[in-house]
From Swiss-Prot:
GO terms for molecular function: ATP binding; ATP hydrolysis activity; proton-transporting ATP synthase activity, rotational mechanism. It is a peripheral membrane protein. Pfam families: ATP-synt_ab (PF00006), ATP-synt_ab_N (PF02874), ATP-synt_VA_C (PF22919). This is ATP synthase subunit beta. Its EC number is 7.1.2.2. It comes from Cutibacterium acnes (strain DSM 16379 / KPA171202) (Propionibacterium acnes). F-type ATPases have 2 components, CF(1) - the catalytic core - and CF(0) - the membrane proton channel. CF(1) has five subunits: alpha(3), beta(3), gamma(1), delta(1), epsilon(1). CF(0) has three main subunits: a(1), b(2) and c(9-12). The alpha and beta chains form an alternating ring which encloses part of the gamma chain. CF(1) is attached to CF(0) by a central stalk formed by the gamma and epsilon chains, while a peripheral stalk is formed by the delta and b chains. One of its GO terms (cellular component) is proton-transporting ATP synthase complex. Keywords: ATP synthesis, ATP-binding, Cell membrane, CF(1), Hydrogen ion transport, Ion transport, Membrane, Nucleotide-binding, Translocase, Transport. PROSITE patterns: ATPASE_ALPHA_BETA. ATP binds at G169, G170, A171, G172, V173, G174, K175, T176. InterPro entries: AAA+_ATPase, ATP-synt_VA_C, ATP_synth_F1_bsu, ATPase_a/bsu_AS, ATPase_alpha/beta_chains, ATPase_F1/V1/A1_a/bsu_N, ATPase_F1/V1/A1_a/bsu_N_sf, ATPase_F1/V1/A1_a/bsu_nucl-bd. It is found in: Cell membrane. Produces ATP from ADP in the presence of a proton gradient across the membrane. The catalytic sites are hosted primarily by the beta subunits.
């Protein structure tokens, strides 16, 4: 599918009219006159009446089943739809608004605004949600690190500009705050835009997110699209494409670096499985759709860097029953460049962002990409933390005093590293009262080198808590000395 622009005037154009012949839940069969059969993925419009009110319903053509009949998936409940109801073929795929008009607003899968009066929104351009990925010649050949200014991310799990990051974490470990912080930093440090796609979001979660983003002052820089948990599977399957299409416009037309959040990518696979079952396809492993890898690839291949500009994606990944071999998360992992795992144990100690430094990974934590000094420092930090983890059982039974002198030093430095990995964030300022900080990667590497070398062994570990660079540690240490 090309990047054809669909103007607001042509989005409701009718190129053919058919009639509903069968409705089974969200699956609708529609018969068209000979020669007017709509193409696969075309959007069809139907008006259904429920309790005296007429509702517009959008269908998407999924199959041609013969005898001038198409099988379509409804993106809204099919209540009120009857046999013989008129169906209008738009002659084009579902299209959504793109551009600055999307920022600060909440949209559904078909591009209807949800948090404002539609008459107050002036949409000048729409793009179809089904588009080809960038041509190979247009891709950015160099791998570049996205410097976030967050120490733990930049040092231990560096993000690729135009890459895909998997975000793992249960409820209450700081996932939403980290998402908001990344949106803030992309807007203020890079002048970029963020798009949030809620795939199968709980209504309460979506509402809380919008309110929190508004309070944090990042809503104005963000376009939000939601296909909620109570909506038909067709909506949940396509909502990620709606968000991605908006992000592609910011990248390709406005030449911005874009941050795309998908929460939750597992529900994208789950919705595809439901649609596949509704269409009568033979299930594959563990009941998933046979085209799982294909559907995932069509989404992920569009998330990339073109020359000079990028879409960087953070995708929340739910792992069913913590089974990493499940086909849905396993298919997602094949596309990820970095994984950021949020730890409940670290969060319980009040250390935020609660990123687990030992289980989080990155493809570019390699001297070839980040440089030898960065790589050596990250490796040394991980070795100290790993040794500290191994010593915890001994400490729990015998106490720190029974350790060798070398191990005592290791534990003391590990505790300073753990404290120094915490950082004051901009969006959490209202909770902590501490202003946010952006730490350049060179300062981050130098700070952790000082801890690993023992240059700051004389400074109490409290001075390292919730700070930015090592300069702030020194300021805290000076205050502590003055206070006696």
């Amino acid at each position: 599918m090309t990047a054809t622009t669909i103007t607001p005037e042509t989005k409701d154009e009718v190129v053919g009219v058919g009639r509903v012949v069968r409705v089974i839940g969200p699956v609708v069969d529609v018969e068209f006159p000979a020669g007017q059969l709509p193409e696969i993925l075309n959007a069809l419009h139907v008006d259904a009446e429920v309790m005296g009110e007429t509702h517009a319903i959008t269908l998407e053509v999924a199959l041609h089943i013969g005898e001038n009949v198409v099988r379509a998936i409804s993106l809204k409940p099919t209540d009120g739809m009857r046999r013989g109801t008129e169906v209008r073929d738009t002659g084009a795929p579902i299209s959504v608004p793109v551009g600055d008009v999307t920022k600060g607003h909440v949209w559904n899968v078909t591009g209807d605004v949800l948090n404002a009066d539609p008459s107050t929104i002036e949409v000048t351009e729409r793009w179809p949600i089904h588009r080809d990925p960038p041509a190979f010649d247009d891709l950015e050949p160099e791998t570049e690190m996205l410097e976030t200014g967050i120490k733990v991310l930049d040092l231990l799990t560096p993000y690729v500009k135009g890459g895909k990051i998997g975000l793992f974490g249960g409820a209450g470990v700081g996932k939403t705050v980290l998402i908001q912080e990344m949106i803030y930093r992309i807007a203020h440090n890079f002048g970029g835009t963020s798009v949030f796609a809620g795939v199968g979001e709980r209504t309460r979660e979506g509402n809380d997110l919008i309110n929190e983003m508004d309070e944090a002052g990042v809503l104005k820089d963000t376009a939000l699209v939601f296909g909620q948990m109570d909506e038909p599977p067709g909506t949940r399957l396509r909502i990620a494409l709606t968000g991605l299409t908006m992000a592609e416009y910011f990248r390709d037309v406005q030449n911005q670096d874009v941050l795309l959040f998908i929460d939750n990518i597992f529900r994208f696979s789950q919705a595809g499985s439901e649609v596949s079952t509704l269409l009568g396809r033979m299930p594959s492993a563990v009941g998933y759709q046979p085209n799982l890898a294909d559907e995932m690839g069509q989404l992920q291949e569009r998330i990339t860097s073109t020359r000079g500009h990028s879409i960087t994606s953070m995708q929340a990944v739910y792992v069913p029953a913590d089974d990493y071999t499940d086909p849905a998360p396993a298919t997602t992992f094949a596309h990820l460049d970095a994984t950021t795992e949020l730890s409940r144990e670290i969060a319980s100690r009040g250390l935020y962002p609660a990123v687990d430094p030992l289980t989080s990974t990155s493809r570019i934590l390699d001297p070839l990409y980040v440089g030898q000094e960065h790589y050596d420092t990250a490796t040394q930090v991980k070795q100290i933390l790993q040794r500290n983890k191994e010593l915890q059982d001994i400490i729990a039974i015998l106490g720190v005093d029974e350790l060798s002198e070398e191990d005592k030093v290791t534990v003391a430095r590990a505790r300073r590293i753990q404290q120094f990995l915490s950082q004051n964030t901009y969006t959490a300022e209202k909770f902590t009262g501490v202003a946010g900080s952006t730490v350049p990667i060179a300062d981050t590497v130098e700070g952790f080198q000082m801890i690993c070398r023992g240059d700051v062994d004389h400074i109490p570990e409290q001075a390292f808590f919730n700070v930015g660079s090592m300069d702030m540690v020194m300021e805290n240490w000076d205050k502590m000395k003055k206070e006696g």
